[in-house]
């Protein structure tokens, strides 16, 4: 028996280095969170999730949570602020005004205009999106479809929009810099991504862009922020998978990312938002473009995780060239 026991010990000692090598890897794999989960420190709630519980609601009902729906429509411009009861949070009635508001939203996003919170409307409303309102100061769509296109393009329908009063820059060379907010991505990657995003607009417009070190002197100021960051309560960021970013029309120049999002660089899965895609969209706002209701356009308000949308569509190009003639 002695020789057999010795052979077993010899075999065990032979595999010991392999066991010692694999053990730390096994421990690490058990302690590492799945890649699709929000990064540490991120908010795990989804700000628009409450809308799913309201699916099927229609005029004449009183349902808990409808006051939040009214706040959603207020935030994105469909309901004037003086008409919503946002202080007491007790207005849960689906009245005529809310029905009209839902219809306006459905019309803008090419949904069936039912006035009810049907499945398609709820699905659209719960997607992550830009924080810039679709409607400003009660302004509805201008109805300018096809009006600005030349004779060779009359078969094309335009969906681009401008901000009220059509604000625009009075110069063609714009400088930009980076604010010292929350660091969500390393500065060199951010600089490279933003340079690429600006270049996409430069190729189709009158503009040239230059990064400068003194952000206070820059025309355009870019940074990452959380929650209420000084832009007013209605422009507060809301955490993971809500509003992704916002930017101000000329000559405002401020462009802010929500630091609580999972930002990625050309992500290959649905665990991150592509930083450059959102940057291209927000730069359009900086230059004076409002949201487009063309789903292929960069200036379309809604976005999603794992998507990459950086190439300007015909509608984006027509919009910026129309605004600056």
Segments the model singles out, each with a brief description of its role:
Residues 2-325:
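Zinc-dependent metalloendopeptidases
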